[in-house]
Amino acid sequence: QGVTERHGDEATFRPVPSAGARHAFETYLYCRRVEALEEGIYRYLPLEHRLLFEFTEPGLAARISEACFGQRFVGQGAVTFFWSVIPYRMEWRYGPAAHRVLPMDVGHVCQNLYLSAEAIGAGACAVAAYDQEALDALLHLDGEEEFVIYLAPVGKHAVSA
């Protein structure tokens, strides 16, 4: 979701479609096995195209898996991407229709992750089954103005026997 073009203070263009170029999502990452990065939660800063370390704590992988109803693979990948939504970024422009385009937009974002993962020989798995309150709390989101909408762990493909 890095910025590819800026139009003053009005809009940014990115390599993923967004209704009205509103880009209502934030990207958080749980980096577990990423070279040169401390294990923990990071936030992606699209204007600077960099990661901001947010926090770490013991047992993050287990807490993430638990918040995803025991899906262990979610917390065990090299990195897990979380997308949160800030609905107001879309609502001020589209009103009630915003809630119809947000799921499509986050799907576009996740599809780009699938394509990127495949390009480097890795795999991704979109996950929408999670405990909303637990995951919002884990990422320190308020659950109202900003909340998790989708996530996807990324890692090496399983080796076939």
Language-model segments: residues:
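A generic secondary-structure signal for well-formed alpha-helical elements
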Residues: 3-4, 117, 156
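Short proline/glycine-enriched turn/loop segments at secondary-structure junctions
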Residues: 137-144
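Small-aliphatic-rich amphipathic alpha-helix that forms the alpha element of a beta-alpha
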Residues: 27, 81-83, 87-90, 94, ...
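Conserved hydrophobic/aromatic beta-strand scaffold that supports enzyme active sites
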Residues: 41-43, 80-82, 151-153
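A structural signal for short secondary-structure junctions
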Residues: 118, 144-146
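C-terminal helix-cap and adjacent tail motif
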Residues: 56, 147-161
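Solvent-exposed coil/turn segments that connect beta secondary-structure elements
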Residues: 32-34, 86, 157
